[in-house]
């Protein structure tokens, strides 16, 4: 019986993206638990409490890390979706470009919200 | 030799109720993921922007959150986030070859669907409790 060994082709970035999508998911899951806990502890919520949560240095850094993880996670996920449904290369690459632009916009916007004033 | 490819009949079963639980979890994971990317995340960032910006902005949104329609949207958004969260945890376990057999995979899929709804109910309780 002849045995075939599969020769993987390509740049191997698929495996790396697959793994990083999962690592970023774990980062976001941790942050999610923190913010749910913070919201429950500060109940009933008011403006000073809301403001004080987001003025904590560690929470600002955590929020930024969350959005950075989200940027990569959503890029892989949206790219998967676009590759499944958009067959025309020009249309798909245009859509992918739009997704990347929007994600970078979210990242910069988050930084502006956290430290912009 | 190459003839034109035969046109095959296409049939898309778009009725999600026909899917087994793991299939339902999967397509809802995809739909919720896309919805979180747009428009839920920019809406969340906008609300964060306004509510952190000033007391007036905070009060404006606090008043908006009293509206039943807005509450419903928040509950739906929370359900989407929670479903994506728990379905994602299930995929992490499946990637580790935990619960990969047919029966446990179906059971975990049902658990994910239930936890998504329970989380949405929790958010509903939270919103009514802070008033």
Language model segments and positions:
Chain B
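Membrane-embedded alpha-helical bundles that constitute the cytochrome b-like, heme-associated redox core
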Residues: 1-131
